[in-house]
């Protein structure tokens, strides 16, 4: 019985329908409507005085964005749209319905339509969001719930929108920072492999006709080329298999994830970027949750999860344990030996002045700017580095292949 009731109360899926018909004046009209079924479309149009002649479900084209996957940035944009409409005096349900009708993605229209339907029937916004954990995490829902309880949903949604926008911008910067080193390595591997497998063997055949002893450097390069030709399937197959095993272990084992988090923080430049990004996320999350009225002890749990790294997650949970025991947060931060003195001093000033959320927001802004600067610097550094790496690889092999030709020229001369 409970299962039947649950099914009956489950939110209906919303689809896009194309329709055409005749209005009360006898004029032909057509358009699109979001609804859960063709019957609902016909019923809604009858209320508007339209005699429906044709209704069909709108199909998604091959390159249409309609059925695209919902991304975190979509949620950030929707959060900002809700903030704008609430500040303009539009009721929450109507705001959700407007987004559900107008969004370009069918998946987002369906999601927002379900949330709007739930809220319209009396379900609290936070509870309606909790039914979609893939798109709205616990932190998001907790903040909305805090806004509902305090009667300041508009203010809270403004903070949520800002938080999500900053988080996505930071995530994008981190991806960019990781992308460039990966591209340098990939390009170097591809170029080297092509030269060793296809170009060097051509020269080797030419050198055999010389019948002369080759320079040491040329012999060394040809030896590597022969090794690659005979064992390329083992090299590439073994590498692919090792990557597969690592990815599988990473997904299955928390310990592997934790060790990976520790390792990447030690990588030059990239590790520094990730350190600063983790501190920015910690400060931004703690500022947002604390300013929303969530108790500091609970806010620290959210900040630990949002830090995105095992080292920082463990450190923040250790800070929380000290705070639970009665220690001030700035003193607790000193015990983990991870945060810079500047951060600890700003937190201490915030505690003493009663404006810890403002100070943490400033800390987050500082580190977000530092991440921006580091990523831009890394980009500027790697552009010439790619040229140098390729120049050394290609140039070295070209020299190795032309040394015998120069030597032959000297002998002839």
Swiss-Prot record:
Gene3D superfamilies: Type II secretion system (T2SS), domain F (1.20.81.30). This is Type IV pilus assembly protein TapC. It is found in: Cell inner membrane. It comes from the Bacteria. Belongs to the GSP F family. Involved in the translocation of the type IV pilin. The keyword Isomerase does not apply. Pfam families: T2SSF. InterPro entries: GspF/PilC, T2SS_GspF/T4SS_PilC_CS, T2SS_GspF_dom, T2SS_GspF_sf. GO terms for cellular component: plasma membrane. Its main location: membrane. Keywords: Cell inner membrane, Cell membrane, Fimbrium biogenesis, Membrane, Protein transport, Transmembrane, Transmembrane helix, Transport. GO terms for biological process: protein secretion by the type II secretion system. It comes from Aeromonas hydrophila. It is a multi-pass membrane protein. The chain crosses the membrane at residues 180-200, 227-247, 286-306, 386-406.
